[in-house]
A protein has these predicted regions:
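Structural preference for solvent-exposed beta-strand-turn elements
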Residues: 1-366
Length: 366
């Protein structure tokens, strides 16, 4: 194998592919990137058997070939090279990287030890804009559970409906549901559970543009193609909880709250609240919302802001972090908070935007 390309481009490609490498594996091949020559580019692939990422780098190919190289080592070497052309050559299991007066030889692995990415057909696929998918991920992924003993809840449910795509995440204390209108041509609309890690890495690849992301789904795998990068992930097996039954359909109180001011005050109150299970107490009286937090070891916090209220006064407590997570990504000037009783779940929605619902369980006030 002999090729040359921009050091910057090759380093960037290795950085992208390396995101599929979760950590130090006992099998060196799972810590490696497969480099393959093709007509006018290098194809870089990393795959840890759960998540795989493949991208290409423009290159001049002199001699075709392939070799698996340690991802971290190759990235560290390239990051220290000057920003000029790098020559790549391989013989047997050694890969040589030469840039100006620097010359490094790294020990690689046989390419036939590298497991290829799963082949996922496009017969069950759809397209969505990068900006729309990025917002959907950011507005749901934070609600997924981090408890690995409940594997199903560590993922994000992807639901395909009538001209609609929906993402759902829950850790049982809160639920985030985000939908978007998308033309769907496939008749197979079975829901699937995408691992949080895959969604997190995908969100790093997509941009806030109208360019498309192509999503293809198989029985146990899902594929995303964006900006010339392919991300493949294994799906989580199992039955996702019936999330629709926990979304209240009625309310007795409705608050209209300015998002930025509310977020600022919750963040400030959380400085004290984090010493008392992150509890902040919301009290509604007339058109004033007060926030209080108290810790015997730290002190007290008090905030107030003007709101628009429908219904009677109420006192209810929430986890401050769970409020902050939603308010940080809602993206509108105001939110609606729909309430019934102090120990019943609350529903929060953006003002002036359809398709986003956040359900939050309250905490005991005392």
């Amino acid at each position: 194998m002999r090729a040359s390309c921009s050091t910057k481009d090759l380093y960037h490609g290795i950085q992208i592919a390396s995101r599929a490498i979760a950590g130090r594996s006992a099998w060196p091949i799972l810590n490696s990137i497969l480099i393959q020559t093709e007509d006018d580019h290098l194809r870089l692939t990393a795959f840890d058997l759960e998540l795989g990422i493949e991208c290409t780098v423009p290159a001049e190919i002199e001699q075709k070939g392939s070799l698996a190289v340690p991802a971290r080592l190759a990235g560290d070497v390239l990051s220290s090279f000057p920003q000029s052309a790098v020559s790549i050559s391989a013989s047997e299991l050694d890969i040589n990287l030469k840039c100006e007066n620097s010359n490094y030889t790294l020990r690689g692995l046989p390419p036939d030890e590298f497991r290829p990415l799963p082949d996922i057909p496009n017969d069950r696929s759809f397209q969505i804009t990068q900006g729309a998918l990025r917002n959907m991920i950011m507005q749901t992924i934070f609600a997924a559970s981090s408890d690995e003993s409940r594997a199903i809840l560590t993922g994000v449910l992807l639901v395909l409906g009538d001209a609609e795509v929906k993402l759902v995440a829950t850790d049982t204390n809160r639920l985030a549901v985000r939908s978007a209108v998308v033309p769907l041509s496939s008749e197979n609309t079975s829901p699937c559970i995408v691992p949080r890690r895959a969604m997190d890495e995908l969100s790093r690849l997509i941009e806030d543009t109208d360019d498309p992301v192509t999503v293809s789904i198989a029985d146990s795998q899902i594929k995303f193609v964006v900006n010339g990068v392919t991300l493949v992930s294994r799906l989580i097996e199992g039955q996702f909880p019936n999330y629709e039954r926990v979304i209240p359909t009625e309310y007795t109180r409705k608050l209209t709250i300015p998002t930025d001011e509310f977020l600022t005050k919750v963040r400030r109150a959380s400085i004290v609240a984090r010493e008392s299970a992150n509890r902040v107490i919301l009290r509604v009286q007339d058109d004033i919302l007060t926030l209080t937090a108290e810790s015997g070891d730290v002190g007290k916090a008090y905030e107030e802001l003007e709101i628009v209220r429908e219904g009677e006064d109420i006192e209810i407590a929430f986890n401050a972090k769970f409020l902050i997570d939603f308010l940080s990504v809602v993206g509108t000037e105001g939110i609606f908070m729909e309430l019934t009783e102090p120990l019943r779940q609350a529903v929060m929605k953006p003002v002036g935007q359809e398709g986003y619902i956040y359900v939050l369980m309250p905490m005991q006030i005392r």
